[in-house]
Amino acid sequence: MITRRALLQSVFASAIWTLFKNPAFAAQPASMKDVEALQKNWKLLLADGTKLPLPSEPLKLSKEDWRKRLNPTQFNILREEGTEPPGTSALNNEKRPGVFVCVGCNLALFTSDMKYDSGTGWPSFFTTIPGVFANKTDYKLILPRSEYHCIRCGGHHGHVFDDGPPPTGKRWCNNGVALKFIPKSGSA
């Protein structure tokens, strides 16, 4: 006969095993100190020799030049604040070590260590590389949302919500088409 204590221990062990084998939870930082370390050491995920622009190097182009530089979907999202349909980005399943950059200007925005599976259908991150986004309030859906734009080129990337995992509680919900992934093993 199984005792209540043995049953509870079994259920608890099973829950812990499920939690830690799920990649959406396994790599989450335990504290804000861990998040700060990810933010500080993001360059460790760059491929050797990768050169990326700095946030202090603004990129200003005319609307016509942006149309030449971006494909129509990228232009709609980055320059006209559109949103891609959920589940359409190949970056949802990107799990290799590396850095996510703005497709418009190559500014580094996130690392693979900052990414998690939010189940929303968009690439999601619990934090960002510091100083790369400017936020503004978006009223397109009547209720206000916090929208974020690349500090270098002004490109719209997505919205930040307060329903992310601990310790930040943030979900940076990004349009995948607005990002380019540079794997650590490759080059820019």
Where would I find each of the regions flagged by the language model?
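C-terminal segment of N-terminal export signals and the immediately downstream linker at the start
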Residues: 18-64, 68-69
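Intrinsically disordered, low-complexity regions enriched in Ser/Pro/Gly/Gln/His and often acidic
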Residues: 10-12, 35, 59, 115
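N-terminal secretory signal peptides and thylakoid transit peptides that target proteins
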Residues: 1-15
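A short Gly-Trp-Pro
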Residues: 46, 53, 58-61, 67, ...
